[in-house]
Amino acid sequence: MVSSFTSAPRSGFYYFAQGWKLVSQPRIRRFVILPLLVNILLMGGAFWWLFTQLDVWIPTLMSYVPDWLQWLSYLLWPLAVISVLLVFGYFFSTIANWIAAPFNGLLAEQLEARLTGATPPDTGIFGIMKDVPRIMKREWQKFAWYLPRAIVLLILYFIPGIGQTVAPVLWFLFSAWMLAIQYCDYPFDNHKVPFKEMRTALRTRKITNMQFGALTSLFTMIPLLNLFIMPVAVCGATAMWVDCYRDKHAMWR
Protein backbone atom coordinates (compact mmCIF):
# COMPACT_ATOMS: atom_id res chain seq x y z
CA MET A 1 0.00 0.00 0.00
CA VAL A 2 1.34 3.39 -1.00
CA SER A 3 1.01 6.00 1.71
CA SER A 4 -0.13 9.58 1.21
CA PHE A 5 3.28 10.93 2.20
CA THR A 6 3.46 13.18 -0.83
CA SER A 7 2.16 16.39 0.69
CA ALA A 8 4.13 19.50 1.47
CA PRO A 9 6.75 19.13 4.23
CA ARG A 10 5.40 19.61 7.75
CA SER A 11 6.97 20.49 11.10
CA GLY A 12 9.43 18.31 12.97
CA PHE A 13 6.74 17.76 15.63
CA TYR A 14 4.49 16.28 12.96
CA TYR A 15 7.13 13.82 11.76
CA PHE A 16 7.90 12.75 15.32
CA ALA A 17 4.21 12.04 15.91
CA GLN A 18 4.06 10.12 12.63
CA GLY A 19 6.89 7.91 13.87
CA TRP A 20 4.63 6.59 16.65
CA LYS A 21 1.92 5.76 14.09
CA LEU A 22 4.18 4.22 11.46
CA VAL A 23 6.06 1.98 13.88
CA SER A 24 2.92 -0.11 14.40
CA GLN A 25 2.07 -0.70 10.73
CA PRO A 26 1.50 -4.45 10.18
CA ARG A 27 4.19 -4.99 7.52
CA ILE A 28 6.70 -2.85 9.40
CA ARG A 29 6.46 -4.43 12.86
CA ARG A 30 8.84 -7.31 12.12
CA PHE A 31 11.57 -4.84 11.14
CA VAL A 32 11.01 -2.97 14.41
CA ILE A 33 11.68 -5.95 16.69
CA LEU A 34 15.51 -6.04 16.63
CA PRO A 35 16.09 -2.27 17.05
CA LEU A 36 13.48 -2.31 19.81
CA LEU A 37 15.17 -5.18 21.67
CA VAL A 38 18.58 -3.49 21.46
CA ASN A 39 17.14 -0.26 22.82
CA ILE A 40 15.16 -1.91 25.63
CA LEU A 41 18.15 -3.93 26.85
CA LEU A 42 20.71 -1.11 26.67
CA MET A 43 18.63 1.94 27.62
CA GLY A 44 16.66 0.05 30.25
CA GLY A 45 19.80 -1.20 32.00
CA ALA A 46 21.62 2.12 31.61
CA PHE A 47 18.84 4.25 33.08
CA TRP A 48 18.26 1.82 35.94
CA TRP A 49 21.93 2.23 36.86
CA LEU A 50 21.78 6.00 36.37
CA PHE A 51 18.94 6.44 38.85
CA THR A 52 20.96 4.57 41.49
CA GLN A 53 23.78 7.11 41.03
CA LEU A 54 21.89 10.42 40.87
CA ASP A 55 22.09 11.01 44.63
CA VAL A 56 25.90 11.06 44.28
CA TRP A 57 26.30 12.85 40.95
CA ILE A 58 23.91 15.75 41.49
CA PRO A 59 25.53 17.02 44.74
CA THR A 60 28.92 16.75 43.01
CA LEU A 61 27.70 18.83 40.08
CA MET A 62 26.06 21.37 42.41
CA SER A 63 29.35 21.79 44.29
CA TYR A 64 30.63 23.76 41.27
CA VAL A 65 27.97 26.44 41.81
CA PRO A 66 29.72 29.60 43.08
CA ASP A 67 28.60 31.21 46.33
CA TRP A 68 27.01 34.16 44.55
CA LEU A 69 24.62 31.78 42.75
CA GLN A 70 23.66 29.69 45.78
CA TRP A 71 20.43 31.65 46.18
CA LEU A 72 19.33 30.10 42.85
CA SER A 73 20.08 26.54 43.94
CA TYR A 74 16.38 25.61 43.95
CA LEU A 75 16.35 26.39 40.19
CA LEU A 76 19.81 25.05 39.40
CA TRP A 77 19.17 21.66 41.00
CA PRO A 78 16.52 20.66 38.40
CA LEU A 79 18.85 21.96 35.66
CA ALA A 80 21.61 19.73 37.02
CA VAL A 81 19.30 16.69 36.90
CA ILE A 82 18.23 17.53 33.34
CA SER A 83 21.87 17.99 32.33
CA VAL A 84 22.82 14.55 33.60
CA LEU A 85 19.82 12.97 31.87
CA LEU A 86 20.64 14.76 28.60
CA VAL A 87 24.31 13.78 28.53
CA PHE A 88 23.69 10.25 29.77
CA GLY A 89 20.71 9.69 27.48
CA TYR A 90 22.54 10.88 24.39
CA PHE A 91 25.64 8.82 25.21
CA PHE A 92 23.75 5.55 25.57
CA SER A 93 21.40 6.23 22.66
CA THR A 94 24.54 6.65 20.53
CA ILE A 95 25.83 3.25 21.66
CA ALA A 96 22.42 1.68 20.99
CA ASN A 97 22.35 3.21 17.51
CA TRP A 98 25.82 1.84 16.76
CA ILE A 99 24.73 -1.67 17.69
CA ALA A 100 21.41 -1.46 15.86
CA ALA A 101 22.61 0.57 12.84
CA PRO A 102 22.22 -2.25 10.24
CA PHE A 103 18.70 -3.03 11.48
CA ASN A 104 17.73 0.65 11.66
CA GLY A 105 18.84 1.02 8.04
CA LEU A 106 16.70 -1.96 7.05
CA LEU A 107 13.71 -0.54 8.93
CA ALA A 108 14.12 2.82 7.14
CA GLU A 109 14.44 1.06 3.77
CA GLN A 110 11.33 -1.08 4.20
CA LEU A 111 9.25 1.80 5.55
CA GLU A 112 10.30 4.03 2.65
CA ALA A 113 9.20 1.33 0.21
CA ARG A 114 5.90 1.07 2.06
CA LEU A 115 5.32 4.83 1.98
CA THR A 116 6.28 5.37 -1.66
CA GLY A 117 5.52 2.10 -3.43
CA ALA A 118 9.13 2.03 -4.66
CA THR A 119 11.07 -1.22 -4.89
CA PRO A 120 14.12 -1.27 -2.57
CA PRO A 121 17.27 -3.26 -3.32
CA ASP A 122 16.82 -6.95 -2.47
CA THR A 123 19.37 -6.98 0.35
CA GLY A 124 18.21 -9.72 2.73
CA ILE A 125 20.20 -10.81 5.77
CA PHE A 126 23.34 -11.59 3.75
CA GLY A 127 23.19 -8.21 2.07
CA ILE A 128 22.96 -6.56 5.48
CA MET A 129 25.98 -8.49 6.76
CA LYS A 130 27.96 -7.56 3.65
CA ASP A 131 27.06 -3.90 4.17
CA VAL A 132 28.05 -3.79 7.86
CA PRO A 133 31.62 -2.41 7.26
CA ARG A 134 30.24 0.49 5.21
CA ILE A 135 27.52 1.17 7.79
CA MET A 136 30.06 1.16 10.63
CA LYS A 137 32.30 3.53 8.67
CA ARG A 138 29.34 5.89 8.41
CA GLU A 139 28.77 5.66 12.18
CA TRP A 140 32.43 6.55 12.74
CA GLN A 141 32.01 9.61 10.51
CA LYS A 142 29.13 10.80 12.70
CA PHE A 143 31.11 10.10 15.86
CA ALA A 144 34.18 11.97 14.57
CA TRP A 145 32.01 14.99 13.76
CA TYR A 146 30.26 14.85 17.13
CA LEU A 147 33.12 14.15 19.57
CA PRO A 148 35.15 17.42 19.47
CA ARG A 149 31.99 19.50 19.76
CA ALA A 150 30.72 17.41 22.65
CA ILE A 151 34.05 17.73 24.49
CA VAL A 152 33.91 21.54 24.26
CA LEU A 153 30.38 21.56 25.67
CA LEU A 154 31.26 19.13 28.46
CA ILE A 155 34.16 21.38 29.50
CA LEU A 156 31.64 24.20 29.97
CA TYR A 157 29.95 22.16 32.71
CA PHE A 158 33.04 22.58 34.90
CA ILE A 159 33.07 26.38 34.63
CA PRO A 160 31.33 27.79 37.74
CA GLY A 161 28.12 29.59 36.88
CA ILE A 162 28.20 28.75 33.16
CA GLY A 163 28.16 25.00 33.78
CA GLN A 164 24.94 25.19 35.76
CA THR A 165 23.10 27.75 33.61
CA VAL A 166 24.24 28.11 29.98
CA ALA A 167 25.79 24.67 29.39
CA PRO A 168 22.54 22.66 29.82
CA VAL A 169 20.77 24.83 27.24
CA LEU A 170 23.64 24.54 24.75
CA TRP A 171 23.84 20.78 25.29
CA PHE A 172 20.10 20.38 24.67
CA LEU A 173 20.33 22.29 21.38
CA PHE A 174 23.41 20.32 20.36
CA SER A 175 21.85 16.96 21.21
CA ALA A 176 18.68 17.91 19.30
CA TRP A 177 20.74 18.60 16.17
CA MET A 178 22.85 15.48 16.61
CA LEU A 179 19.81 13.23 17.07
CA ALA A 180 18.27 14.70 13.92
CA ILE A 181 21.50 13.84 12.10
CA GLN A 182 21.61 10.37 13.67
CA TYR A 183 18.13 9.29 12.66
CA CYS A 184 17.77 11.16 9.36
CA ASP A 185 21.03 9.61 8.23
CA TYR A 186 19.53 6.11 7.92
CA PRO A 187 17.38 6.84 4.84
CA PHE A 188 20.10 9.11 3.42
CA ASP A 189 22.70 6.38 3.85
CA ASN A 190 20.41 3.80 2.25
CA HIS A 191 20.72 5.91 -0.89
CA LYS A 192 24.50 6.32 -0.49
CA VAL A 193 24.24 10.09 0.06
CA PRO A 194 27.64 11.30 1.43
CA PHE A 195 27.68 12.39 5.08
CA LYS A 196 28.65 15.99 4.27
CA GLU A 197 25.93 16.27 1.63
CA MET A 198 23.40 14.88 4.11
CA ARG A 199 24.30 17.54 6.70
CA THR A 200 23.99 20.25 4.06
CA ALA A 201 20.54 18.96 3.11
CA LEU A 202 19.39 18.94 6.74
CA ARG A 203 20.53 22.54 7.20
CA THR A 204 18.11 23.65 4.47
CA ARG A 205 15.30 22.68 6.87
CA LYS A 206 17.09 23.33 10.13
CA ILE A 207 14.04 24.38 12.15
CA THR A 208 12.13 21.24 11.15
CA ASN A 209 15.08 19.04 12.07
CA MET A 210 15.69 20.86 15.35
CA GLN A 211 12.04 20.36 16.30
CA PHE A 212 12.30 16.66 15.48
CA GLY A 213 15.60 16.27 17.33
CA ALA A 214 14.37 18.22 20.36
CA LEU A 215 11.36 15.94 20.85
CA THR A 216 13.55 12.87 20.34
CA SER A 217 15.98 14.20 22.95
CA LEU A 218 13.18 14.89 25.44
CA PHE A 219 11.67 11.42 25.03
CA THR A 220 15.12 9.86 25.42
CA MET A 221 15.15 11.25 28.99
CA ILE A 222 11.73 9.87 29.97
CA PRO A 223 11.80 6.41 31.59
CA LEU A 224 9.77 3.71 29.79
CA LEU A 225 9.09 5.92 26.77
CA ASN A 226 12.82 6.02 26.02
CA LEU A 227 12.76 2.24 25.57
CA PHE A 228 10.74 2.66 22.37
CA ILE A 229 12.26 5.84 20.99
CA MET A 230 14.80 4.33 18.58
CA PRO A 231 12.42 2.66 16.07
CA VAL A 232 9.93 5.52 16.48
CA ALA A 233 12.59 8.10 15.57
CA VAL A 234 13.78 6.00 12.60
CA CYS A 235 10.21 5.87 11.28
CA GLY A 236 9.64 9.60 11.83
CA ALA A 237 12.93 10.50 10.13
CA THR A 238 12.08 8.25 7.19
CA ALA A 239 8.72 10.00 6.78
CA MET A 240 10.60 13.31 6.75
CA TRP A 241 13.03 11.95 4.14
CA VAL A 242 10.13 10.93 1.88
CA ASP A 243 8.49 14.36 2.10
CA CYS A 244 11.51 16.65 2.14
CA TYR A 245 14.57 15.03 0.57
CA ARG A 246 13.74 11.96 -1.48
CA ASP A 247 12.93 13.71 -4.76
CA LYS A 248 16.41 15.21 -4.91
CA HIS A 249 18.57 12.49 -3.36
CA ALA A 250 16.92 9.10 -4.04
CA MET A 251 19.09 6.42 -5.67
CA TRP A 252 16.24 3.95 -6.21
CA ARG A 253 12.62 4.79 -7.07
UniProtKB/Swiss-Prot annotation:
Record field: transmembrane: 31-51, 75-95, 151-171, 222-242
Entry's Gene Ontology cellular component terms: plasma membrane
Disulfide bonds listed in the record: none
BP GO annotations: cysteine biosynthetic process; sulfate assimilation
Principal location: membrane
The family this protein is said to belong to: Belongs to the CysZ family.
Job of this protein: High affinity, high specificity proton-dependent sulfate transporter, which mediates sulfate uptake. Provides the sulfur source for the cysteine synthesis pathway.
Protein name: Sulfate transporter CysZ
Gene: cysZ
